[in-house]
Amino acid sequence: MSNDEFSDNERLKQQSQLLRGTIKEDLHNELTGGFLGDNFQLIRFHGMYQQDDRDIRQERAAQMLEPLHTVMLRVRLPGGIISPQQWLGIDEFASQHTLYGSIRITNRQALQLHGVLKRNIKPVHRLLHQLGLDSRATAGDVNRNVLCTSNPVESRLHHQAYEWAKKISEHLLPKTNAYAEVWLDGEKIAQPEEEPILGNNYLPRKFKTAVVIPPQNDVDLHANDLNFIAIGDNGQLTGFNVLVGGGLAMTHGDQSTYPRLATELGYIPLNATLAVATAVVATQRDLGNRANRRNAKTKYTIDRLGIEVFKAEVELRAGLAFQPLRPYAFSSRGDRIGWVEGIDGKHHLTLFIPSGRLIDKPGKPLKSGLAAIAAVHTGDFRLTPNQNIIIAGVSERNRAQIDALAQRYSLIDDTVSPQRKSAMACVSYPTCPLAMAEAERVLPDIVDRLDAILIRNGIADRDVIFRVTGCPNGCGRAMLAEIGLVGRAVGRYDIYLGGNREGTRIPRLYKENQPLEEIIRDLDALLSAWAQADNPDEAFGDFAIQTGIIRPVLNSSIDFYLQD
């Protein structure tokens, strides 16, 4: 492929001096609060997205002002583990140096700080460095934050799996010194640099990796390019089943784009893990589509080449043959809210955090509560892919103190319904530049109305995996929900039905471009019919398929867009 056929993102990566660009110079440009030219894209590789407050965009334009530019910074936390001391440092920065004063737990076990002004960007990177953290490769065409199942009960296996998640993350990080040079005033490297795994043009598109511990599929493995499913023997990790090619993003009106479940390749022993991770990434690096970013993800590479060709290429590069898959099964995706005791005798408290947003509100000082717990906790915090937080490793002696703090700050709330615990939304408005419709801000009201429907039908103890995403890029993972809403325009969504509770089936389009009030009426009728079927063991997504409300998606590359 000639350079003329590459997308412009390939040009800017090629000319970026291994992700340096002119970011340092842009930091000193006080005429704008944003980043210009290629730097707008390049800062993503450093873990940031340029945004503005869309609620006041028109008002500022009327005043002849540029948009209120800020960045959203994403902290890299492989497996979602963070110490109380690290948490307190981030908490203080969020309170004092961001416009919104909040911390957001992402569904990829990272932390996001929204509303960081240009003058505070370098200080936040220095703070992260002092805390032993960074934001490298949490955005851009690289391997993103590596997920790991949040399983505090099986502590030995979880710890082993987490260690591998951390190893994979470090192994696949960009090797350029650009991050240290730009943000930490590190010494400039004199000798030529190379990116031995990612390549000097990096990957064709973002790449997501997860380590999964059955029977929990909290990481939503089918949203990821590369998955390592932990296989254990008597609580000891022995190897991984490898799955590739998952992904949920699509583009409205472009049927060459679609969500896709990951495909099984086979089993590998532990000592082959990094070789296989490298081989999968390198195969996508060399064979992925660099001309059309809409079709640049690993899922499209696999469907274009065929899974057997892709598998053979990975085996060749890794120098091995995949063994037959080991048995595994998933039973759930949700978090066990409340206290559980691990096999090590330590106690773990999982706290429900609505949409992962930690902020102090009247009667709900959640952010202050987590800071109060962090000040006395001697274990660690674990962020879950359901955007909750686990106070992990609490001794019997300290349990009462932690529980009292959680109660005092309303972090424990027994009135939260099962349905609210099973709902998820992306950030969307006001900060996401891609948002087409509300998501996080409208979710509480939608769930209130769903709860009312369930209560009226006598099934308040049941719930549906329900997700709202403000655009079709998939951050809210609506394409793995039993009911998913995908934003079309302000106040309007596509309705998808028929995913399952385990997260192993893609839902199908039920109705397109519906106003929210119509959606609530439709869901009222659907949930009422589910209740009247009077089968407590049948999940809603299964009910929708069994009764013919929607046809199952069997092979999304072929039948995702087929309609009755």
Swiss-Prot record:
Gene Ontology, cellular component aspect: sulfite reductase complex (NADPH)
InterPro entries: CysI, NiRdtase/SiRdtase_haem-b_fer, Nit/Sulf_reduc_fer-like_dom_sf, NO2/SO3_Rdtase_4Fe4S_dom, NO2/SO3_Rdtase_4Fe4S_prot, NO2/SO3_Rdtase_4Fe4S_sf, NO2/SO3_Rdtase_FeS/sirohaem_BS
GO biological process terms on file: cysteine biosynthetic process; hydrogen sulfide biosynthetic process; sulfate assimilation
Keywords: 4Fe-4S, Amino-acid biosynthesis, Cysteine biosynthesis, Heme, Iron, Iron-sulfur, Metal-binding, NADP, Oxidoreductase
SUPFAM superfamilies according to UniProt: Nitrite and sulphite reductase 4Fe-4S domain-like, Nitrite/Sulfite reductase N-terminal domain-like
Cofactor binding comment, as recorded: Binds 1 siroheme per subunit.
Function description: Component of the sulfite reductase complex that catalyzes the 6-electron reduction of sulfite to sulfide. This is one of several activities required for the biosynthesis of L-cysteine from sulfate.
PANTHER family: SULFITE REDUCTASE [NADPH] SUBUNIT BETA (PTHR11493:SF47), SULFITE REDUCTASE [NADPH] SUBUNIT BETA-RELATED (PTHR11493)
UniProt record similarity statement: Belongs to the nitrite and sulfite reductase 4Fe-4S domain family.
The protein's name: Sulfite reductase [NADPH] hemoprotein beta-component 2
